[in-house]
Amino acid sequence: MENALKRLNALPATEAEAELLACCGASRWVQGLVARRPFGSVAELFAAADEIWRSLGREDWLEAFARHPQIGETAVEKQIKSETGQHISSRWSAEEQSGAQRNSADIVARLAEGNRAYRQRFGYIFIVCATGKTAEEMLAILERRLQNDASAELTIAAEEQRRITRLRLEKLLGAETR
């Protein structure tokens, strides 16, 4: 991980931005993290990533959410609309959502309907850190979160995005465990 951190620190800004965009689609988060380089340790990188994320607001969070495929949607059904980091982000999304890819037609239909209801209610896609969750678990979470008020749900979705971003930073650095 330390060698990967050294490489990230040494990359030209545009290349570092492209790699970090695969971790989080909020451009101000990416720019803020690139501006803070070099990082002395992985822990320092993670702390900066969290600090920057928590300093952002609604529009930044929505920008990050918009770069995700919906839960249950395959990479073929949606190519992430990013000019950089697309192939890495698409692959990571597919891996993270693997629990939603192998399920019954009923679960797929219920996830699709839940996604539509969620987008209609909140104005953005359902964001959940899907790693390690089954489709049934994600559906239950989606159904529970549909009951939230808009403010509470945005806060929850932003925290889920932060968790996704942390996992993707770990992948970027070559870590296999949290």
Residues covered by each model-derived region:
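Aromatic-anchored, charged helix-turn/loop surface patch used as a conserved interaction hotspot
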Residues: 1-24, 28-114, 163-178
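C-terminal non-catalytic interaction appendages of large macromolecular assemblies
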Residues: 97-178
